[in-house]
C-alpha cells in the first residue's frame, strides 16, 4: 500500500503470539470508509509465532519492528511511535479487541484540536474465583471513579488505549526510558501531556474490550508490587503532581495493610495462598483478603522499589 496513513496504530507486544490474532482480526474488520491507517507491531524480544503471524498478514498495512531481546514496553512504544507516518498516533495494546469503528473514533476525537484521548478498558476475565470475588467489582469502581474525576486529573488514566496527534508527540517527546519495568510509563506520559498545556480527556465511545492478564490474586499482587515501585519513580520525577498519599492513613484496615507490607513475603506467593482460600471462604471474606494482598503488595513495592525486577 502506497497511501499516506491518517492514523498509525502502535502495538507493543511481548510474547503476544496468542493475543495478536484477535487484535489483527478486529483491525482488519474496521468499517468501510475508515480513514487510512497503518499498524506497527513492535515485537519486544524474538517471538517466532508473532513474527510469522505478522509476515503472513495481508489484510492490513502492517509493519513489524523486532527486538532481538526483551527491552521493555517503553522501548517498544518509542520505536513504534518514531516509525509512525500518520498524524493521529494510537497506542493499542495487543490484548485489546477494538470495535469496528475504533480507528474512525480515535481520528474523529482529534478534529477539534490537539489533545490526549483515552478509552477505558472493558476488562474481560476468564472464570476465576479472583474475578468473581474481587476483579469485576474493582473494575466497576475504577470506571466510576474515572468518569467522575475532575478534568485536571484525567491524565492519571492514560494507559494502553489512547491517542495523540503528531503535534503532541513532537511537543512532549518520547515515553520516559527510566520506567524500565512494569507500570507508570503511561501515567507519566499523560501527566506530561497535561503539563504541556494540552487537554487530556476520556472518550466513552472508545471503551474497548480488554483480555485482562491479571486473572488471579497472585498475578494482580505481583503487578501491584511493581506498580508501587514505579510510582516511587514518578513521584521523584514529578513531586508536584498532586497524587493521593501512597502510604495510607491510620485505621484498623490500613494498619493491616501497613503491617503486611513490611513482611518479606513475595506478593505472588501470598496471592497464591489467597487464591486457594477463595474456593472455600465466604465471598465477603475473600474480597477482603484479595484487597489486603493487593494493597499491601503495592505499598511494599512503593517502600522497596529496588525489589522490582521483572518486565511484563
Regions found by a protein language model. Name each.
Residues 101-133:
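Conserved donor NDP-sugar-binding/catalytic core segment of glycosyltransferases
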Residues 89:
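Short aromatic/hydrophobic "clamp" motif used to bind/position activated sugar donors
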Residues 26, 43-52, 69, 93-97:
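A conserved acidic beta->alpha catalytic loop
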Residues 25-36:
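Short, acidic, metal-binding catalytic loop of nucleotide-sugar glycosyltransferases
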Residues 136-154:
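Short, flexible, basic/aromatic active-site loop/helix in glycosyltransferases
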Residues 161-164, 168-173, 179-206:
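A short, conserved alpha-helix in the catalytic core of glycosyltransferases
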Residues 67-84:
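Glycine-rich, basic loop-to-helix element that forms the pyrophosphate-binding segment
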Residues 225-226, 243-312:
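Non-catalytic, C-terminal membrane-associated alpha-helical segments of glycosyltransferases
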Amino acid at each position: 500500500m502506497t497511501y499516506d496513513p491518517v492514523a498509525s496504530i502502535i502495538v507493543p507486544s511481548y510474547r503476544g503470539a496468542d493475543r495478536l490474532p484477535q487484535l489483527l482480526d478486529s483491525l482488519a474488520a474496521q468499517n468501510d470508509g475508515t480513514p487510512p491507517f497503518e499498524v506497527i507491531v513492535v515485537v519486544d524480544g524474538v517471538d517466532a509465532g508473532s513474527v510469522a503471524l505478522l509476515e503472513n498478514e495481508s489484510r492490513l498495512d502492517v509493519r513489524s519492528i523486532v527486538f532481538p531481546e526483551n527491552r521493555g514496553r517503553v522501548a517498544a512504544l518509542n520505536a513504534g511511535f518514531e516509525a509512525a507516518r500518520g498524524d493521529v498516533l494510537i497506542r493499542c495494546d495487543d490484548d485489546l479487541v477494538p470495535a469496528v469503528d475504533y480507528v474512525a473514533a480515535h481520528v474523529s476525537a482529534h478534529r477539534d484540536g490537539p489533545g490526549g484521548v483515552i478509552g477505558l478498558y472493558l476488562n474481560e476475565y476468564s472464570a476465576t474465583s479472583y474475578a468473581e470475588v474481587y476483579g469485576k467489582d474493582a473494575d466497576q469502581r475504577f470506571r466510576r471513579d474515572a468518569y467522575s474525576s475532575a478534568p485536571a486529573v484525567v491524565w492519571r488514566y492514560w494507559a494502553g488505549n489512547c491517542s495523540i496527534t503528531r503535534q503532541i508527540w513532537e511537543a512532549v517527546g518520547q515515553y520516559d526510558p527510566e520506567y524500565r519495568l512494569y507500570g507508570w510509563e503511561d501515567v507519566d506520559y499523560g501527566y506530561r501531556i497535561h503539563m504541556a498545556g494540552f487537554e487530556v480527556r476520556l472518550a466513552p465511545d472508545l471503551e474497548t474490550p480488554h483480555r485482562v492478564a491479571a486473572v488471579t490474586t497472585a498475578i494482580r499482587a505481583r503487578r501491584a508490587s511493581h506498580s508501587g515501585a514505579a510510582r516511587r519513580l514518578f513521584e521523584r520525577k514529578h513531586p508536584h503532581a498532586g497524587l493521593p498519599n501512597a502510604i495510607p492513613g491510620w485505621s484498623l484496615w490500613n494498619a493491616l495493610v501497613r503491617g503486611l507490607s513490611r513482611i518479606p513475603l513475595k506478593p505472588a506467593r501470598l496471592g497464591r495462598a489467597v487464591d486457594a482460600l477463595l474456593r472455600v471462604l465466604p465471598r465477603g471474606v475473600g474480597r477482603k483478603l484479595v484487597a489486603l494482598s493487593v494493597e499491601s503488595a503495592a505499598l511494599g513495592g512503593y517502600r522497596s522499589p529496588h525489589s522490582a525486577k521483572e518486565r511484563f
